Each structure stands twice: as C-alpha cells, then as structure tokens.
C-alpha cells in the first residue's frame, strides 16, 4: 500500500473502513460469530452447573454400564479375531495338504510363568520338528506364549 498522499487518501480510507466494518459485522454481530460462541459457552456452563448434581449421582451406574459394554465388545472382538485366525490356519493347512507341503497346522496358546520358559521352548521346538522328507516352508505350530509374571516375553 503506497503512502498516503492527497490524491489517493480518500479511496484508501474508504476501502479501509469498508473492510474493517465488514469484518466487524461478520465477526461480532452475527449469531455464529465470536459473540454468538461466547453466548453459547455461557449457556452451556450454566446448564452444566444446574445439572451437575444429577450427573454425579448417576455416574457410578453409567460408568459400570459403559465398562461392561466395553469389556463385552472387546471380548467379542477378541473371540471373532481368534475364530478368523483359526479358520485361516485350517484353510492354509488344507491348501498345504493339497500341494503336499506342510505350512501351518495348529493355532494354540500356552500360558506359564517365567520359570517354565525353557520347558515351553523345548515343547514348541519338539512339536514343530518334522522328520519327513517334505520341505517345511513355515512353522508347523504358531503359538502365543503369555508369561504371567510379566518379567519377560517369549516370541515363537
């Protein structure tokens, strides 16, 4: 914007006022503007302060219902995932038998404490050992091992 001179002073002042008044009308005098948002926030705070006692009295039961629904949803999701993985393992095993190769034959879970790690690893290696002449392209068993005491993890 050039410096204000006597020839363009009026037009610059006119456009400056027009822009500022337009922004003022859009921001402050409209219900969706800044003043409208502040009115909505004040009303919301008043409603929450009046209903605060009711919400607190119903909170434990609602919280228990929410937790129960969340746990049941998580449990059903876990079981559906487990059934899908088991179905996938069966399908892969069936396809492997048709092609005369061993791919995946089992999906299981072993739970134990940290003291049982060596025994679990021995059982996994013993069950996945194959003496036949067919080539093994993947582990025979896929096992999820959970260590109860949380001191370490076993991945197989």
Swiss-Prot record:
Lineage top rank: taxon: Eukaryota
GO BP terms, alphabetized:
ATP biosynthetic process; proton transmembrane transport
- Pfam families named among the record's database cross-references: YMF19, YMF19_C
Q: Where are the transmembrane segments?
A: 8-28
Q: Name one GO molecular function term.
A: ATP binding
How does this protein assemble? F-type ATPases have 2 components, CF(1) - the catalytic core - and CF(0) - the membrane proton channel. CF(1) has five subunits: alpha(3), beta(3), gamma(1), delta(1), epsilon(1). CF(0) has three main subunits: a, b and c.
The record's family statement is: Belongs to the ATPase protein YMF19 family.
Q: What the protein does?
A: This is one of the chains of the nonenzymatic component (CF(0) subunit) of the mitochondrial ATPase complex.
Q: What is this protein called?
A: Putative ATP synthase protein YMF19
Report the source organism. Triticum aestivum
The taxonomic lineage of its organism, from the top, reads: Eukaryota, Viridiplantae, Streptophyta, Embryophyta, Tracheophyta
This protein's encoding gene: YMF19
